[in-house]
Structures are given as structure tokens and as C-alpha cells.
């Protein structure tokens, strides 16, 4: 079996180490309404279309209870749309600062292209948001062959439609000749639902939720424990393989090709 294409996520996978751009914005829009949410709660739905992310936060039992305590009722669709519009406005203003490619990504992409591998991408950001991210990422040397956003298909993650559209545009089939790489639970589900080899990247991921400085300064035993927690979470949600850094991806690819593995 030959791998012909790799589909990458963006924030937390190829750019924005730790996926911090949306995090504080989610926390801020709830705080403004007197409802405090934790960073862990804000990260849990990461990878979804952002309005779906806001909706998922309002459906978490603790947050829903706190909202009801403050407002006397559960959040409505009008509340969700109002918060999303506010989220988007703030995010647009900060996105240019969160499009830096993660160390090693550009080199891995170049190596894959030397092998004739096509590079696709999916995201939880809207097309309008991605226009900002792509523009900045290109200036810094990262540009996949194709991008699909949730705006381009009937539904975003965990549905497989963004991966299918990548496959059509890149001209690659069957789906098990492609690898999906991401940093969230919804990425793992997207890849598996699409019938692709699915790989979770840990360092720099939203699931790990650490800055580069925190990773470098953390006690090695504590860091290893956190890495293993994320690794297990990825596997439990469908990852065929996990890698700590993007530099390990080609080893995974060679393993799949040499062993003639079959997706199960």
C-alpha cells in the first residue's frame, strides 16, 4: 500500500503551538456574562466548527447549571449566536498572531512533497477566519495544496466530509491511501469516520494545552505523564498511531507501507 496524501489540521497541529488563539476568547465571552469556564472545559470541544464549539460548551452540565443560576434559564440558540458573533469578532483581531508554523512542520511537508505526497488540510475555523491564517502562514513558508473548511461542506467534524472533499480535489482514492493528522479528539473521529489512517500529534496539541516554554521547563516525569494521558485519549477516540512531534510522521508512514497494514 502506498500513502498518497496527508490531510493536516491547522491550529495545534501545523500552526499555533498549543492552539491558544481560540482558548481565551471562549473564556472571555462567557466571563462577560458572569459565567466562568475553565481552560480545560474551553478546550474539550476544540476542533469543531466554532459555533458548534460554543453550543457544546453551553451543553456541558456544569456550565449549563451555572448559566441557569445566573440567568434563571438555560442558554437559548439566540444566546449561542450572540456569543459566537462576539467570539468571531475578537478572534479575527488576533488570528494574525497565531499562524506561525510549529517547529519542524515545514521541513516535514517539504520531505513529503519530495516523495510525491499531496498535502491537504481541514479545520474548525470558518473560511473567513482561514483567509487570515493562510495569508500569514504562507508568508512564513507553510502552504498545503488544498484547504477545506466547514463552510465548504454540509457539516464539519466529526463528520468526514472535509476529508472526502480533500480526496476529490487532490485526486486520491481509496481513503486508506491517505493519512489524517490532528491534535484533538474531533480530528481522530473525523479521520476514522473518513476511513483514513488517523494520527494524533501530542506536543503542541490542544489536548496537551501547553506552551513551548511550559514543555521545556516542566519536570520530565510530569511531562511524560501528561503526554501519556493525551496519547491514551487519542487512541480511545480512534487514533491508529500517535506521535509526539511531526518529525515522527514519516516513520509511521513507512510502517504502514512496509507492513501492508489494513485499517480496522
From Swiss-Prot:
Its EC number is 3.11.1.1. SUPFAM superfamilies: HAD-like. It catalyses: phosphonoacetaldehyde + H2O = acetaldehyde + phosphate + H(+). GO terms for biological process: DNA repair; organic phosphonate catabolic process. The active site is at residues 9, 50. The keyword Hydrolase applies. Mg(2+) binds at residues 9, 11, 183. GO terms for cellular component: cytosol. Involved in phosphonate degradation. HAMAP family: PhnX. This is Phosphonoacetaldehyde hydrolase. It comes from Bacillus cereus (strain B4264).
Amino acid at each position: 500500500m502506498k500513502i498518497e496524501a496527508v490531510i493536516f489540521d491547522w491550529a495545534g497541529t501545523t500552526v499555533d503551538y498549543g492552539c491558544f488563539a481560540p482558548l481565551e476568547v471562549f473564556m472571555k465571552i462567557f466571563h462577560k456574562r458572569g459565567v466562568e469556564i475553565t481552560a480545560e472545559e474551553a478546550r474539550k470541544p476544540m476542533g469543531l466548527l466554532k459555533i458548534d464549539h460554543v453550543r457544546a460548551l453551553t451543553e456541558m452540565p456544569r456550565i449549563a447549571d451555572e448559566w441557569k443560576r445566573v440567568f434563571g434559564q438555560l442558554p437559548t440558540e439566540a444566546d449561542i449566536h450572540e456569543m459566537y458573533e462576539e467570539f468571531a469578532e475578537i478572534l479575527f483581531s488576533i488570528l494574525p498572531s497565531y499562524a506561525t508554523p510549529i517547529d519542524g512542520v515545514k521541513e516535514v511537508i517539504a520531505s513529503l512533497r519530495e516523495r510525491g505526497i499531496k498535502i491537504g488540510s481541514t479545520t474548525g475555523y470558518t473560511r473567513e477566519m482561514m483567509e487570515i491564517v493562510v495569508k500569514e502562514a504562507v508568508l512564513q513558508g507553510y502552504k498545503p495544496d488544498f484547504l477545506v473548511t466547514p463552510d465548504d461542506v454540509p457539516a464539519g467534524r466529526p463528520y468526514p466530509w472535509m476529508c472526502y472533499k480533500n480526496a476529490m480535489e487532490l485526486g486520491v482514492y481509496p481513503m486508506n491511501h491517505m493519512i489524517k493528522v490532528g491534535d484533538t479528539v474531533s480530528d481522530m473521529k473525523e479521520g476514522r469516520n473518513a476511513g483514513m489512517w488517523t494520527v494524533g500529534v501530542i506536543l503542541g496539541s490542544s489536548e496537551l494545552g501547553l506552551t513551548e516554554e511550559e514543555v521545556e521547563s516542566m519536570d520530565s516525569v510530569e511531562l511524560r505523564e501528561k503526554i501519556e494521558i493525551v496519547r491514551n485519549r487519542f487512541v480511545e477516540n480512534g487514533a491508529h498511531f500517535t506521535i509526539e512531534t511531526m518529525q515522527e510522521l514519516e516513520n509511521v508512514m513507512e510502517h504502514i507501507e512496509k507492513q501492508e497494514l489494513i485499517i480496522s
